Amino acid sequence: MSSGLSLERACAVALGIVASASLVAAGPCDIYSSGGTPCVAAHSTTRALYSAYTGALYQVKRGSDGSTTDIAPLSAGGVADAATQDSFCANTTCLITIIYDQSGRGNHLTQAPPGGFNGPESNGYDNLASAVGAPVTLNGKKAYGVFMSPGTGYRNNAASGTATGDEAEGMYAVLDGTHYNSACCFDYGNAEVSNTDTGNGHMEAIYYGDNTVWGSGAGSGPWIMADLENGLFSGLSSKNNAGDPSISYRFVTAVVKGEANQWSIRGANAASGSLSTYYSGARPSASGYNPMSKEGAIILGIGGDNSNGAQGTFYEGVMTSGYPSDATENSVQADIVAAKYAIASLTSGPALTVGSSISLQVTTAGYTTRYLAHDGSTVNTQVVSSSSTTALKQQASWTVRTGLANSACFSFESVDTPGSYIRHYNFALLLNANDGTKQFYEDATFCPQAGLNGQGNSIRSWSYPTRYFRHYENVLYVASNGGVQTFDATTSFNDDVSWVVSTGFA
């Protein structure tokens, strides 16, 4: 017993040394290693997760010419070099194509392939995330997270060193606590290698959202739960654990870990405070979860069978070998808090003023007499001038409102149909009455940025940041720069998505 206590004391001292060091002196994976449960996968687009790491964090691909570049930390153990991305992606769009594994095992995450469910891209692949949808700062330095709309997913089916069978593992992720939905399943962690549902207990991943089809926690969600396949679990029961609280933090630390007939859910505000344990105990009482049958693939943003209806934002996360101690995880949480995650501006370009009336002029050559307008519920472009009828002027005028889903962006209310807003539905822009739902708020929230063609603004969907207001055959869509839809055509994209904002006609 005395030797065990000595070992425990030694580990505690080692952890104390690591935790008390500066951000660069000890990253999360240094702390896990000191605790005897090293990272076998370490993913982040915002910072290095090892104090000595200087390699690539992620790769972006730009729409203008299809070229790629890697984004590394500013210094060893530091924050991502967002300026390199901003320069590389200037006047075009960029997607995150690879999230590199910092552990040295090569467990990189790339575009998820089809499985039990197809993704929306060509050949059933999932979408890639926009490189600009989730700007943040860490200790005042700008970085970008991974904003994942429904249909977006990353995967590695040939991971090295991850837990299989009933082997022990831990994992954490830092997420946006305000970006979620009830669809299946916004996950990060261990999944099937086949992209299909191979049975109970074949997954062990962090889930975040307010899905109630399987398990749930206290209140109405969202919750941190574990996706163990054929069930989102909040505790021992396959249904409800009142000890698993609804989350309201902007930045969330989510923790799941599991070993033989033992697992745990923990969580915290990633910007302050310490971890709380929401469940720690035996495996779920339903059949198939003791022992577990983990397969060792890694997923992000999707379910194990490529269920891809969920949404969320990922900043950083790791998977470990072995079952981390609470003390180790507490030190990791302290490091996350020390990183000082904070929100950053979602907009750029000519400023919009809430309460003002605006009109939006097309900048595409040959169409510059046209303005964004509506005809009933259809949003389109029409030729408008000072001599147009009052009715047409009103149809082409929009009141700027604070973003219904995110106050850092904007919503656009019709001048001639008060209470109705521009929203996207199946990627067409429509004018619909505000029904007060979370879905409508998200569909009707847009973030202006400096115009991609150098004129005015390009207006990006908050909920689908790869997509922008675009006129195509005089009808409005939220379009991506290349894609499976006809209105995603790359030809004249930058011009078609750039709009000059003027004082409203009405």
Curated annotation (Swiss-Prot):
Keywords: Carbohydrate metabolism, Disulfide bond, Glycoprotein, Glycosidase, Hydrolase, Polysaccharide degradation, Secreted, Signal, Xylan degradation. Residues 1-26 form the signal peptide. GO terms for molecular function: alpha-L-arabinofuranosidase activity. This is Probable alpha-L-arabinofuranosidase B. It comes from Aspergillus flavus (strain ATCC 200026 / FGSC A1120 / IAM 13836 / NRRL 3357 / JCM 12722 / SRRC 167). Its EC number is 3.2.1.55. It is found in: Secreted. It comes from the Eukaryota. Residues 27-343 are annotated as: Catalytic. The keyword Secreted applies. Substrate binds at residues 227, 230, 304, 424, 426-427, 443, 471, 473, 476, 496. The gene is abfB. Disulfide bonds join 29-39, 89-94, 184-185, 409-447. Belongs to the glycosyl hydrolase 54 family. It is an enzyme of class 3 (hydrolase). Organized into two domains: an N-terminal catalytic domain and a C-terminal arabinose-binding domain (ABD). The lineage of its organism: Eukaryota, Fungi, Dikarya, Ascomycota, Pezizomycotina. The keyword Nucleotide-binding does not apply. GO terms for biological process: arabinan catabolic process; arabinose metabolic process; L-arabinose metabolic process; pectin catabolic process; xylan catabolic process.
